[in-house]
Amino acid sequence: MRKGLFYICLLLVGVGLFAGCKSKKAVVASFSDLDGEWGVVEMNGKTLNPEETHQVLVFDVARQGLSGNAGCNRLMGKIEYNDAYKNIIKFPQVATTRMACPDMSGERELLEALNKVVRFEAQGEAAPVSEIALFGTNNDKLLVIKKQNKITQL
């Protein structure tokens, strides 16, 4: 009887320990989460401040359109996305206006990164999705974008 009671207590303690352990699950981003304005906060491993770089991406999920600011010039293009292939995304033929600015290197780097993007995923562990990483074909993180609260005048 004592042995049986001991095993029952041991079982209850074990179940209690497992129930108390919460595993943190990463937030999963859907295509609709992309809708809206996003500041570029990381590019090719470098941390950026969108208020200084003026690099903003605006996703219009309903029209599958991309617009924004590459730093100096406005950008526009289409989004290739198919519900059958979750988190696979491409930005073919991104175009820009043609204003000349003193330093175009950040803009060129952003446009090259957008051209290489093949998938996206949420960053962090809390909903709603506030940061999304964009990856290239070799699973290299090209960009991290952060949801903006206000719409920037482009």
Identify what each model region corresponds to.
Residues 1-30:
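Bacterial Sec-dependent N-terminal signal peptides
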Residues 21-154:
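Lipid interaction determinants
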